């Protein structure tokens, strides 16, 4: 588990230290997620990465963790999608912020045969905006997370706060790939 601290009930800060022995690199990703930022017109997630000299511990770089997260997270999902057998036709995405957009791009690149894209976001405008990027595929903005995943054989959730009620995936395709 990631080390976590909180200053508010609907917020988190995670520390993710790492050392890569083969390349002798050491650093830390520090990510904050604050649900109440939506109402303030601010990004939900902020992050930085600090790289240190492995010999002395001296900080040598401070990097924008937001951009790195924006690219890395859907990249990992893309590798998973590429190596799971099958040719999905119906993609469902729950959460249509920046991660939802990037995951849509990756899913369409890895699985160009997708014919349907369903999306849910509590902000229906964001769902519609993201769906406009799906090209000539059949698209639908869902009324709930459970509605979004109905019949899907590829499900991606990009939310970091718990859904209430919990997401029920029992109505997905029995062979669906679920990427939380």
What are these regions (language model features)?
Residues 95-97:
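Glycine-rich Rossmann-fold phosphate-binding loop(s) that bind the pyrophosphate
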Residues 100-101:
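N-terminal Rossmann-fold NAD(P) dinucleotide-binding loop
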Residues 84-90, 113, 173:
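Short helix-loop-beta connector
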Residues 110-134:
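NAD(P)-binding Rossmann-fold cofactor-contacting core
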Residues 171-180:
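ADP-ribose/adenylate-binding Rossmann-like module
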Residues 137-152, 167-169:
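Short acidic low-complexity segments
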Residues 1-70, 78:
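N-terminal ligand-binding/catalytic initiation module
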Residues 159-161:
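Short glycine-/small-residue-rich Rossmann-like dinucleotide-binding loops
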């Amino acid at each position: 588990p990631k080390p976590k601290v909180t200053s508010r009930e609907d917020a988190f800060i995670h520390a993710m230290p790492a050392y890569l022995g083969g390349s002798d690199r050491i650093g830390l990703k520090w990510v904050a997620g604050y649900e109440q930022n939506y109402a303030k017109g601010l990004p939900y997630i902020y992050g930085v990465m600090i790289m240190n000299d492995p010999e002395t511990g001296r900080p040598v770089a401070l990097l924008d963790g937001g951009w790195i997260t924006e690219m890395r997270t859907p990249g990992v999902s893309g590798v998973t999608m590429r190596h799971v057998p099958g040719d999905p036709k119906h993609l469902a995405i729950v959460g249509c912020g920046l991660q939802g957009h990037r995951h849509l791009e990756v899913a369409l690149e890895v699985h160009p045969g997708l014919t349907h894209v369903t999306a849910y976001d509590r902000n229906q405008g964001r769902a519609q905006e993201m769906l406009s990027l799906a090209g000539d595929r059949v698209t639908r903005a869902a009324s709930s997370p459970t509605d979004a995943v109905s019949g899907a054989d590829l499900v991606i959730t990009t939310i970091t706060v718990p859904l209430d009620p919990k997401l029920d995936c029992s109505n997905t395709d029995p062979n669906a790939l679920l990427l939380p």
